Regions:
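ATP-dependent small-molecule kinase phosphotransfer cores
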Residues: 2-78, 89-92, 127, 134
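Short, hinge-like loop/turn segments at secondary-structure boundaries
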Residues: 17-21, 100-103, 179-180
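Conserved phosphate-donor/acceptor-positioning beta-strand/loop module used by diverse small-molecule
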Residues: 57, 76-100, 111-116, 162
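Alpha-helical scaffold elements adjacent to nucleotide-binding pockets in ATP/GTP-utilizing enzyme cores
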Residues: 68-72, 96, 119, 174
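Arginine/glycine-rich "motif VI" loop of SF2 helicases in the C-terminal RecA-like domain
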Residues: 72-78, 102-108, 152-154
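Cys/His-rich short segments
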Residues: 94-136
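NTP-dependent small-molecule kinase module
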Residues: 123, 127-181
Length: 181
């Protein structure tokens, strides 16, 4: 599992050149420019631990990124098996993300109801980009930049749509089934 968000947050925390460039976009809820993300993902996808397959989380987010991914995978002679759309009502997304909390110690994702991390007992905090204004801006950016990927992957006969408004265990089971796991 490769999460562009995790990679970018680590780059910001470590103040790498990419992290410094990306921070302003992330804090505003904007997409990090395609060229930066494509370079980052190309470097990561070429690592030996991805040879048997990988789940990409947060990439691609634009049609330009999708075309770049197609090129990368063709060069590596690897197929793209599916593009999952976990479909959730925008107001549900706002509620979920603004109540999301993360453990400072182990990175466990929890909710505002968790006073301490259920995994390790560490302190829970709200990520800077999980405030309502930033979440709503991210949804606007999604509509403009990422939603066109639905038609792109439908046209490639790779789109698998999953109803994300259900219990997490049911959604997870559907994701596993869609991926053949």
């Amino acid at each position: 599992h490769i999460s562009t968000g995790d990679i970018l947050r680590a780059a910001v925390k470590n103040q790498t050149p990419l992290g410094v460039k990306a921070k302003g976009f992330m804090d505003a809820g904007e997409l990090v420019p395609d060229d930066l993300i494509i370079d980052l993902m190309k470097e990561r996808i070429e690592q030996p631990d991805t040879e048997k397959g990988v789940i990409l989380d947060g990439f691609p987010r634009t049609t330009t990124q999708a075309v770049a991914l197609d090129t990368m995978l063709a060069e590596l002679k690897r197929p793209l098996n599916a593009a999952l759309l976990i479909d959730v009502d925008f107001e549900v997304i706002v509620k979920r993300l603004t109540s999301r909390r993360m453990c400072k110690e182990c990175g466990h994702i929890g909710s505002v109801a968790d006073a301490a991390c259920p995994a390790c007992g560490g302190e829970m905090y709200q990520r800077d980009d999980d405030n309502e204004a930033t979440v709503r801006n991210r949804l606007d950016v999604y509509e403009k930049s990422t939603a066109p990927l639905i038609d792109y992957y439908r046209g490639c006969d790779l789109l698998v749509s999953i109803d994300g408004d259900r219990d997490v265990d049911v959604v997870y089971a559907d994701v596993k089934q869609a991926l053949g796991l």
